[in-house]
């Protein structure tokens, strides 16, 4: 990716999508998204995000069975739906990902540290999910993030027998501008921020 990306592309002009054009998203584009998002910062480079790119009809039907009724159409019609998950055992990879501190794995290991590890995985996996959205927009795709689904059902369908848990799902493709709602208001700086 060599193009200069504007803030408007990433934020101001980008919209959450409700419908999709019939345009393919090649595997190479998904790899490009990951190869950019992986460089976003995470705590001790823990990189807990695990992503399933759902694109086959069979996999979409499996996912559609676990989403809220309002999201079924969005799942079935998106060229790709990313299931953004996080690995609660992310720390098993820390010797590889954070090699300058040999003790780093011990910060998260053991039953007494399970809550800390879970919080770390969820927080940093969420960050990486946001990086996925920014990377997808940067390479010219639109996004439709969704949280209206049954996490336990998605985990059973896609992550059974693993230590990965679902966080949110996100349609990826070329959005149908006719299906986008008018932009909703946002909070002003003074409403959301404090200078201390």
Swiss-Prot record:
Membrane-spanning parts: none
Protein's name according to its UniProt entry: Putative NADH dehydrogenase/NAD(P)H nitroreductase HadB
Segment forming the signal sequence: none
Family designation: Belongs to the nitroreductase family. HadB/RutE subfamily.
EC number from the UniProt entry: 1.-.-.-
Cofactor: FMN
InterPro entries attached to this UniProt entry: Nitroreductase, Nitroreductase-like, Nitroreductase_HadB/RutE, RutE-like
